[in-house]
């Protein structure tokens, strides 16, 4: 077996090749910057840039409704397609990363996001909204969603895997929310087209960083995975073929396991109660109660800020506490908060609304680190692709909620029923989490 501790001569291909010559022993990890942290850092920026576009739809529902006369349900359909593809593309993207490499897949995805975002400024009909927001951007963000996180942490980290999963997850989730105030302000003062161009530029600007600094495996630069013990082959390149076929084969395999369906079902409810409902319709719902859109967008941005702390803390806790207990707590408390949300909405931000924002931020995507770890425990090397399918269920739930809530709003003139249904479903997700059976060898 090749000694992965030995340094590899620089190839000159990129700055990353010259930053990673230090051996990757446990001792060295304590004194030098392991290249895994460089990959994780660039991954954080890439996920943040990709998430920027996803902040646009919820803010622009009303401007598009006003300019084109499209119904809330019509606009929500385009957003739903985006969410659906965001999930359904994920497992295939994970397999393509195995086949062609992280760098090529992620750079291609960022270009797609930029193209879809930029083309929205030329649309005049509803089908064009579906083609740009829904199709192009949906494929792009789906190609570098949560399986991207699972692939980086699975290949590059042994130690601190849960923590890094939390940090990278926070980038994807928080990026969607922290851009909201800027997008809302630009849309209010300059129209909805400028924000679309801005987020296209953000996504495109990340491409050079990914190309220069991201590598597929630790062994590509002569090191082991961060925290791997001496003599371990963790981080070695594993020849994998199959691409899309492998994604389907993994699905056929994991679909025979009850644990997969329990995780997928719970995660579908997670998507419905976050991206699908709150992420898409909170600004419009608050506006229905007299709150200015910029204020509502600012509140969602605060959700994103607190999400950083909550998701990182969840990753840290996932390394120490049974992930099922964490999911039980997250889903239960989220359900309770959704049940009381209708009573908190109004023209002014009351202290009780601030409490909701802080709590919902801490809980927003805190479910991801324990779910990723459970997928790795249950499905081993197929964990990233299995999580891709679990995440697909997350986005199916989000798409259904986005469309369903829009229909409820059009039919009843209020989102109240949507909040109550989501709260009840979160209780079901909490129960499903505790039914997952961990392997006997799991911590």
Question: How would you describe each model-predicted region?
Answer:
Residues 48, 116, 128-144, 268-269, ...:
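Hydrophobic core of transmembrane alpha-helices in multi-pass small-molecule transporters
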Residues 167, 176, 365, 378-412, ...:
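A late C-terminal transmembrane helix in Major Facilitator Superfamily
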Residues 111-124, 333-346:
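C-terminal ends and interior cores of transmembrane alpha-helices
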Residues 168-221:
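Helix-loop-helix hairpin linking two adjacent transmembrane segments in secondary transporters
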Residues 133-170, 380:
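Cytoplasmic helix-loop-helix junction between adjacent transmembrane helices
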Residues 89-102, 311-323, 409-410:
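Helix-to-loop junctions at the C-terminal end of transmembrane segments
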Residues 38-72, 90-93, 180, 276-283:
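Extracytoplasmic
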Residues 57-61, 252-312, 401:
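Extracytoplasmic gate region of multi-pass secondary transporters
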């Amino acid at each position: 077996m090749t000694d992965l501790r030995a340094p590899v001569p620089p190839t000159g291909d990129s700055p990353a090749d010259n930053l990673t010559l230090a051996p990757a022993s446990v001792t060295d990890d304590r004194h030098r910057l392991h290249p895994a942290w460089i990959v994780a850092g660039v991954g954080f920026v890439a996920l943040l840039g990709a998430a920027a576009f996803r902040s646009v739809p919820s803010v622009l529902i009303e401007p598009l409704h006003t300019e084109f006369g499209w119904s809330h349900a019509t606009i929500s359909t385009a957003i739903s397609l985006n969410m659906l593809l965001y999930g359904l593309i994920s497992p295939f993207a994970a397999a393509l990363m195995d086949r062609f490499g992280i760098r090529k897949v992620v750079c291609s995805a960022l270009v797609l996001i930029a193209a879809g975002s930029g083309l929205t400024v030329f649309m005049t009909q509803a089908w064009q909204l579906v083609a740009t927001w829904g199709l192009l951007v949906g494929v792009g963000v789906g190609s570098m969603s949560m399986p991207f996180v699972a692939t980086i942490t699975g290949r590059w980290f042994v130690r601190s895997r849960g923590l890094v999963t939390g940090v990278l997850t926070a980038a994807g989730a928080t990026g969607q929310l922290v851009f909201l105030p800027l997008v809302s302000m630009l849309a209010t003062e300059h129209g909805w087209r400028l924000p679309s161009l801005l987020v296209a530029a953000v996504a495109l600007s990340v491409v050079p960083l990914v190309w220069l600094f991201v590598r597929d495996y630790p062994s590509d630069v002569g090191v082991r995975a961060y925290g791997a013990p001496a003599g371990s082959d963790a981080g070695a390149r594993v020849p994998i073929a199959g691409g899309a076929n492998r994604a389907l084969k993994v699905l056929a395999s994991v679909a025979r396991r009850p644990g997969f369906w329990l995780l997928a079902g719970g995660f579908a409810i997670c998507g419905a109660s976050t991206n699908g409902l709150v992420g898409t319709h909170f600004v419009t719902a608050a506006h229905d109660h007299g709150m200015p859109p910029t204020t509502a967008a600012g509140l969602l941005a605060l959700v994103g800020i607190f999400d950083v702390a909550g998701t990182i803390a969840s990753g840290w806790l996932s390394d120490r506490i049974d992930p099922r207990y964490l999911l039980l707590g997250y889903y239960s408390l989220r359900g309770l908060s959704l049940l009381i949300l209708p009573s908190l909405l109004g023209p002014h931000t009351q202290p009780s609304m601030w409490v909701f924002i802080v709590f919902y931020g801490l809980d927003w995507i805190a479910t991801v680190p324990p779910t990723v770890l459970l997928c790795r425990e249950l499905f081993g090397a197929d964990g990233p692709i299995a999580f891709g399918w679990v995440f697909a269920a997350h986005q199916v739930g989000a798409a259904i909620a986005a469309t369903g809530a829009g229909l409820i709003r059009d039919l009843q003139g209020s989102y109240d029923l949507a909040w109550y249904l989501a709260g009840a479903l979160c209780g079901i997700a909490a129960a499903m989490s505790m039914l997952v059976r961990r392997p006997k060898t799991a911590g």
